[in-house]
Amino acid sequence: MTGKKSSREKRRKRSGQEAAASLAAPDLVPVLSGSAGGCGSGGCCGVAGGGTSVAGGAERSERRKRRSTDSSSSVSGSLQQETKYLLPSLEKELFLAEHSDLEEGGLDLNVSLKPVSFYISDKKEMLQQCFCIIGEKKLQKMLPDVLKNCSVEEIKKLCQEQLELLSEKQILKILEGDNGLDSDMEEEADDGCKVAPDLISQQDTCVDSTSSLRENKQPEVLESKQGKGEDSDVLSINADAYDSDIEGPSIDEAAAAATATPAATAVATAASEVPENTVQSEAGQIDDLERDIEKSVNEILGLAESSPKEPKVATLTVPPAEDVQPSAQQLELLELEMRARAIKALMKAGDIKKPV
């Protein structure tokens, strides 16, 4: 029994060694398997079958390793090829960007440069030059949020529309850095300066016409004043009487009492001395005067009733006699009579003004 056990253990050790050898060197697996298959014992063949299965697993793992290495090598090779093609193109672009005479917007520096104001007559060309100077990238950075979604062509159209609205002077001032509002104010001031001389000339003509009219009216006014000397005396008398009425009713009553008696005596004496013809003429004149006085009194009363807060001086007009010239006594009598009439009228007006 001990001999059989020892032989079995030896076989197991050999099979283990063969398996280890097959893992280390898979090419030796067929040799070992052939040698194992040549033995006549059944136990040895069983051990050899186990060794072949272990060797097949080792081969599969090796194949997987080879595939992974092959795929990694292929990927690395493709990356190397791509870098070979991409690097020269990038280097060329960088080199051209550093050493080219063309800027971002397409401005060729080899061509002689001209100021933007040179193209002011052709607004479309001027706009194109401005866009060439700025460039699309800078333009996109400069644009506000509202216009960020617009294309370059749309922005060009908008700029063209705005340029068409501006005059050449305004464009020059904008290029020089002046504000657009200041330029508008200056143009309005220039227009105002142009209009001002026209207004001044019109005012001068108006002044000349008014001065000539005044010069023409002055002699007429002098003649009318000379012709109405007698009326002015009558008006002054009435004004004095009206002022006395404003001062107080007691003074008016005293003045009326003082002037009424001499007026009556003067009329009586004058009637005895004057002839009949003169008496008739005087009576006609007195009647006319009385009518005029009554009219004036009615006007005074109407004014007093309509506007009691704003008293006005009533003017009594005496029509001058055309044929007969009155004497000095007659004029004095007429003045006294008119005073009495005016005082009575003013007294009546004062009574109307008093509250009931």
UniProtKB/Swiss-Prot annotation:
Phosphothreonine modified-residue sites: 69
InterPro entries linked: CAAP1
Biased composition (Basic residues): 1-14
Residues with the Phosphoserine modification: 68, 100, 183, 307
GO annotation (BP), single: negative regulation of apoptotic process
One Pfam family named in its UniProt record: CAAP1
Positions with biased composition (Basic and acidic residues): 214-231
Cross-link (Glycyl lysine isopeptide (Lys-Gly) (interchain with G-Cter in SUMO2)): 84
Coiled-coil residue windows: 276-306
Region (Disordered): 1-24, 54-80, 208-234
UniProt keyword terms in alphabetical order: Apoptosis, Coiled coil, Isopeptide bond, Phosphoprotein, Ubl conjugation
General function of this protein: Anti-apoptotic protein that modulates a caspase-10 dependent mitochondrial caspase-3/9 feedback amplification loop.
Protein name: Caspase activity and apoptosis inhibitor 1
Source organism per UniProt: Mus musculus (Mouse)
Gene assigned in the entry: Caap1
